[in-house]
């Protein structure tokens, strides 16, 4: 049986996710680093955020999804997986891009941690000011 696969790369904060979609006849199974999403992520909201493009396009049961994700925390990893799924779905069917773009799922969230500056305690926290 020749399985057709689609690849998408997603990034968010310091996380990178390689997403592989495999067409399947049975219920869509998702594995993240060889684990179930419920075992990998601590709460359901992160999983719902990650599965949003599949729910929107109603293609959740059509694909088995294999994800390799590295770096960052859980929300960053979920955002990276979501973007990877979106990019792979667009490779599967370019007509889905219009639907996904209306929900702003195709754009990468470029927000990242601001760097620490010298003379300060953090990115913006300054030493306490003394008037006299």
Curated annotation (Swiss-Prot):
UniProt key word Ribonucleoprotein: yes
RNA-binding recorded as keyword: no
Keywords carried by this UniProt record: Ribonucleoprotein, Ribosomal protein
Listed GO biological process terms: translation
One of the Pfam families matching this protein, by short name: Ribosomal_S9
Any one GO CC term of the record: cytosolic small ribosomal subunit
GO molecular function annotation: RNA binding; structural constituent of ribosome
Stored InterPro entries: Ribosomal_Su5_D2-typ_SF (IPR020568), Ribosomal_uS9 (IPR000754), Ribosomal_uS9_bac/plastid (IPR023035), Ribosomal_uS9_CS (IPR020574), Ribsml_uS5_D2-typ_fold_subgr (IPR014721)
Family label: Belongs to the universal ribosomal protein uS9 family.
Family matches, as HAMAP family: Ribosomal_uS9_B
Protein name: Small ribosomal subunit protein uS9
Organism: Mycoplasma genitalium (strain ATCC 33530 / DSM 19775 / NCTC 10195 / G37) (Mycoplasmoides genitalium)
Designated gene of the protein: rpsI
């Amino acid at each position: 049986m020749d399985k057709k696969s689609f690849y998408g790369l997603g990034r968010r904060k310091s996380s990178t996710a390689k997403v592989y979609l495999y067409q399947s006849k049975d219920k869509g199974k998702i594995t993240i680093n060889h684990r179930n999403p419920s075992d990998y992520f601590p709460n359901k909201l992160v999983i719902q955020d990650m599965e949003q493009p599949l729910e929107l396009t109603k293609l959740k049961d059509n694909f088995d999804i294999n994800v390799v994700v590295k770096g960052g925390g859980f929300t960053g990893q979920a955002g990276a997986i979501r973007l990877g799924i979106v990019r792979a779905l667009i490779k599967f069917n370019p007509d889905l891009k219009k639907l996904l773009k209306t929900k702003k799922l195709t754009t990468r969230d470029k927000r990242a941690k601001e760097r620490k500056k010298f003379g300060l305690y953090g990115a913006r926290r300054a030493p306490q000011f003394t008037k006299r």
